[in-house]
Amino acid sequence: MERLRRLGLLSLLAASVGCADDAAVDPFAGPVPAQCPVTSTEQSMVMTKLVLLRQSAPGISDGFNLDGRVSGADDALSCRRRDLTNPDGTAGVDNQLSLLVPALDTATAGALDAAIQGAINNGQMMLAVSIEGLDDRLNDPCVTVVFRRVQGSPFVGSDARIDPGQTFDTIREEPVSRVTGRMRNGVIEAGPFALGLPVAVLTARFVIPIQNAQLRIRWRADDTFEGLVGGGIPAAGMIAATETLVIGSDLMGLVRRLILSITDLDPDEDGNCRSFSAAVAFEGRAAFVNP
């Protein structure tokens, strides 16, 4: 009997230790899984605003540290392009596109932001983002973020933004980008991944290939969203895309030279960088997306 009682106590002790171990497991520990568990809950949004981030002051820009370095003019691995500083004081931000945006403003007679907004509002350039595999809308150790180009005839409110709650159709022949990430306190972080950012502004039609993209999305309580995407854009591809713009040859040559002057990522064998860093901010509102 005494032996049985001791065995029982040992079993209870082992069980309690096992429970304690289970309770101590941090679901956010380790790398993000390549695939998240499937759940019946997802949330979609349509981008209602998209902005190519400029420098708010010389050397100051939001964005990501894409190469894990804080580079100065003496850093050969970044082709001697100086990193920027986040508005909160964090150094190492990679957003060389911010040096090109003023030239793009010139190409559109100072109406770059308005042209992008107009293309979104008239349904010409709509991108939907879906958050799949949701277990919790504040803290979730694994969610899948899906970018799709969509089409439809959006209703626009008095605030000059697409109204929430509308339904749009996926453009099936367009590429779809997926990435797994984590959500903490309503903020999703994910990457790196490949993202094709469609541009349909004025007469321009092209896709910007963003490599090794990093993503941050804040999901607010009112089902609005704000986000930031950063990554590397191949210089050769961007030059080819800008050649579709209806601008003069002098300005085209200037844009080409500017692109080649801001490359700071993906150095080749000779140390010449083949891509430049970029950061894009966006806002979104809840929507329904037909597959």
For every predicted segment, state its role.
Residues 22-291:
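Extracytosolic secretory-pathway proteins
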Residues 9-13:
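Hydrophobic helical h-region of N-terminal Sec-dependent signal peptides
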Residues 1-8:
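Bacterial N-terminal signal peptides that target proteins for export
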Residues 15-18:
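C-terminal motif of bacterial Sec signal peptides marking the signal peptidase cleavage site
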